[in-house]
Amino acid sequence: MTIHHETRPTLNLIRLANGEGLELPAYESQGAAGMDLRAAVDGDAPLTLPPGKRALVPTGFIFEIPEGFEGQVRPRSGLAFKHGITCLNSPGTVDSDYRGEVKVLLANLGEEAFVIERGMRIAQMVIAPVTQARVAEITAASETARGAGGFGSTGV
């Protein structure tokens, strides 16, 4: 399958003062679904994230997500596996009408303090289409084979 570049949405961004010198968010491989986001922490004062704690880490950019899309902020698998670092409320959603700096809510689920340095790849963002549904209140749910079964009702 060939992806035609002219059909891809354009992601406009604004570099903030704390983002000066950082690489632009980028896809690290040809087939990558997410672009890596980097930490825009002070180069002289890395952020130490103790075990069991969380921190809001700036990226140094304002993103203009195209209308009809969202930015899904997700953990990086290597940080999660090697250090227990993950994103809370994952995936976090960056709405198309948000115009503030994108920040990443990181949590340390590991056993040791983790140091977040300037420019470190801390998360990935997937640009995905969204659908806004019409909401209609009804008086009874339609019948299905599953019914109200949940939480493992279809098997483990």
UniProtKB/Swiss-Prot annotation:
EC number annotated for this UniProt entry: 3.6.1.23
Gene Ontology terms: biological process: dUMP biosynthetic process; dUTP catabolic process
Xref: Gene3D superfamilies: 2.70.40.10
Cofactor(s) this protein requires: Mg(2+)
GO molecular function list: dUTP diphosphatase activity; magnesium ion binding
Keyword Magnesium carried by entry: yes
Family matches, as Pfam families: dUTPase (PF00692)
Biological or metabolic pathway of the protein: Pyrimidine metabolism; dUMP biosynthesis; dUMP from dCTP (dUTP route): step 2/2
Binding residues for substrate: 76-78, 89, 93-95, 103
InterPro entries per the UniProt record, alphabetical: dUTPase, dUTPase-like, dUTPase-like_sf, dUTPase_trimeric
Enzyme class: hydrolase
Keywords: Hydrolase, Magnesium, Metal-binding, Nucleotide metabolism
Keyword Protein biosynthesis: no
Reaction catalysis annotation: dUTP + H2O = dUMP + diphosphate + H(+)
Family: Belongs to the dUTPase family.
Role, per record: This enzyme is involved in nucleotide metabolism: it produces dUMP, the immediate precursor of thymidine nucleotides and it decreases the intracellular concentration of dUTP so that uracil cannot be incorporated into DNA.
Protein name: Deoxyuridine 5'-triphosphate nucleotidohydrolase
Native organism: Rhizobium etli (strain CIAT 652)
Gene that this sequence comes from: dut
